[in-house]
Structures are given as C-alpha cells and as structure tokens.
Amino acid sequence: MDYPLGGAYKAGWNLAQEFTNMYIGHGGEFFKPGSAEVSINNAKGVATLEMLKALSAYMNPDFLTHDSNATSAEWKAGNVAMMNMWGSRMGPLMDPEQSTPTVVKTTTLGDPMTVGGGSTPATTLWWDGWTVAKNISDAEAEATFIAMMNGINHKR
C-alpha cells in the first residue's frame, strides 16, 4: 500500500483541528496561565507540527485537499489502512446499507490515539457540549447545569 494513513488534513479548518488534537495530546495549553494570551509557540507546538509533518509522509501526496469526506472515500476505496476519523463518519462506513461488505467487515474502531508516549488522547470534541466555570460556587454550577439541560431539552 503506497499511502497507508488517511487524515482530514485539508488546508484550513480541518488542518487546524488536527493541530488542535495533536497539541492537546502533547499536553499543550492554548493560553498562558491566568491570561487570554495565546501560547502555542512553544516546544509542544513545535513537536505537534513535527508529528503532523511526519505523519504526512504516509499520506496521499494530495493530503492538503483531504477533508473528512475525501478521507472516508479513500477508506472505502481501500487506499488507506488506518485513519483518525470522527465517530459520526465511522457509522456509515460500518453500515451494510451505506458501505460495501468488504469495508463493513474490515472496519473496526480503536481507542483514541495518544502521542509521544503520553496518556492524554490526541483528540478533541468541543462542539457537542458546554463548560461550567470552575471558579463559581457549587450552587451556581448546579444552576448553570440545570439551565443548560433545559436549553437542550427539545420537549420544552
């Protein structure tokens, strides 16, 4: 197999998301402690860029054009053996009604990958959830949680 690794490295949002994933895996912090000052120009940021570059050596030379749709297509075509993909994209690949029998039979899921011998998953999922500030009282945190739960309740 010429290019065994697939990834959503399309220039722009996709590549930025992959940087974010890998940077978190390296234990990177986006801001200097106690401030809103961006802090990614550091050893962990460089290690992240070096890892992304190293992985690209195993990807299709057009990897900077591959978003999750193109990466899924590469998987379906049998052009890649491993990829880091969103869970929502894996369902169709494993569904006999949406994929081929060979793809369904040979597609499995694994634990989130780590990087550099660390134990922090090199992945993020920030768009389906919310956060509660840690510097508030338990009562305020509970009220925030209840308000958010009511906000997502489609029956209301």
Which residues does each PLM region occupy?
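Paired acidic/hydrophobic, glycine-rich loop segments that form the ligand-binding mouth/hinge
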Residues: A81-W86, P92-L93
